[in-house]
Amino acid sequence: MDHRLLEIVACPVCNGRLYFNKEKLELICKVDGLAYPVRDGIPVLLENEARKLGVDEITQ
């Protein structure tokens, strides 16, 4: 994931910062506890496509 893209994308729910998880290919919103998938290098920033994070994942 291009670091420049991370500077301009935001969580569609809260407009907060997103963090890239290289291992799971997801963009993480720690505020809402959501993980958005990245498919073929393209972030899928749709709330209904997001995965709810567990408490242990949010604190990482």
Swiss-Prot record:
HAMAP family reported for this sequence: UPF0434
Name the UniProt record assigns to this protein: UPF0434 protein PC1_1771
Domain of life assignment: Bacteria
Protein family (similarity comment): Belongs to the UPF0434 family.
This protein's GO CC annotations: cytosol
Pfam families noted in UniProt: Trm112p
